[in-house]
């Protein structure tokens, strides 16, 4: 559930394939894993690993017209440390399967669920989002905030469709252009980070072409980025660096995050996460 520009395109098996298949020397493999562990360390204690908000998740739930009194099965794919999974469990009569490929994040989720008295409603599953062990038409709702980019928007809505019951709801957030024209610096940055970034109309067309009926769409507001994600991350930079001995690699990660934050603050009128809500037709 991390922002694409955090270099967290890792919810599938990509990181492991990269480590195993690239022509690394053994020492380079170790360095890659060390870098990965630093990223986990930066994010694992956060409430969120990407832009979002409880009010916005509840808005999506309302727009999806999910009956709060009916027992449901929900899969939250790319759940991170569980902000959305726990909200769904709290608000609904639902059994939530919270999926992430990072056990560190799931450990945090399980601790939060226990403290909130929700352990009986949330089951964690550590696996890749492109190798989900679900049955056909197993779920009433598939939910994924800030994570579908890991395997690509089109692949995600296409592959996950079979897990949804007919008439079930897909709720996903995806990085989205808000303007027709963008500064070249921003365009180049995102084309490098996530080439599938596109306008809402293009994303909605993809859902329609893959057997969904669009129900609603809205844009995450600025506070979901700044107040709920970036500012808490910034508050943790000093402790993160201290934990990791102010190493060059840790400092490089912090600098990359600062660059990303500055880019958003400069160009926030041009992009955000869009929340896409659609019903499975067939």
Named regions from a protein language model:
Residues 50-70:
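Conserved alpha-helix/loop element of class I SAM-dependent methyltransferases that forms part
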Residues 75-77, 81-131:
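Class I SAM-dependent methyltransferase SAM/SAH-binding core
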Residues 130-141:
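A short acidic, Gly/Pro-enriched loop at the edge of an enzyme's catalytic core
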Residues 141-154:
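A short SAM/SAH-binding and catalytic strip from SAM-dependent methyltransferases
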Residues 155-169:
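A short glycine-rich, Lys/Arg-flanked "PGG" loop and its adjoining helix->strand segment in the class I
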Residues 175-194:
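Short, glycine-/aromatic-enriched active-site segment of Class I SAM-dependent methyltransferases
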Residues 196-211:
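Short alpha-helix
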Residues 218-282:
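Conserved Class I S-adenosyl-L-methionine
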């Amino acid at each position: 559930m991390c922002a694409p520009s955090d270099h967290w395109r890792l919810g599938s098996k990509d990181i492991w394939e990269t480590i195993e298949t690239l022509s690394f020397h053994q020492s380079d493999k170790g360095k890659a894993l060390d870098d990965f562990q630093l990223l986990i360390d930066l994010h694992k204690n956060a409430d969120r690993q990407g832009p979002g908000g409880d009010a916005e998740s509840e808005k999506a739930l309302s727009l999806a017209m999910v009956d709060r009194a009916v027992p449901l099965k929900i899969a939250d794919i790319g759940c991170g440390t569980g902000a959305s999974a726990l909200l769904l469990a709290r608000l609904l009569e639902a059994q939530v399967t919270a999926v992430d490929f990072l056990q560190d994040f799931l450990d945090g989720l399980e601790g939060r669920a226990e403290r909130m008295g929700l352990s009986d409603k949330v089951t964690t599953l550590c696996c890749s989002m492109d190798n989900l062990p679900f049955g056909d038409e197993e779920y009433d709702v598939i939910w994924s905030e800030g994570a579908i980019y890991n395997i690509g928007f089109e692949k995600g809505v296409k592959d996950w469709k079979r897990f949804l019951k007919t008439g079930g709801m897909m709720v996903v957030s995806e990085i989205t252009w808000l303007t027709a024209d963008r500064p070249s610096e921003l365009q180049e940055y995102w084309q490098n980070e996530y080439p599938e970034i596109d306008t809402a109309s293009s994303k909605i067309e993809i859902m329609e072409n893959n057997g969904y009926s669009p129900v609603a769409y809205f844009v995450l507001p600025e506070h979901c980025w700044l107040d709920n994600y970036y500012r808490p991350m910034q508050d943790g930079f000093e402790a993160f660096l201290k934990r990791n001995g102010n190493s060059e690699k840790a400092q490089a990660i912090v600098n990359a995050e600062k660059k990303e934050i500055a880019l958003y603050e400069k160009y926030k009128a041009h992009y955000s996460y869009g929340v896409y809500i659609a019903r499975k037709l067939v």
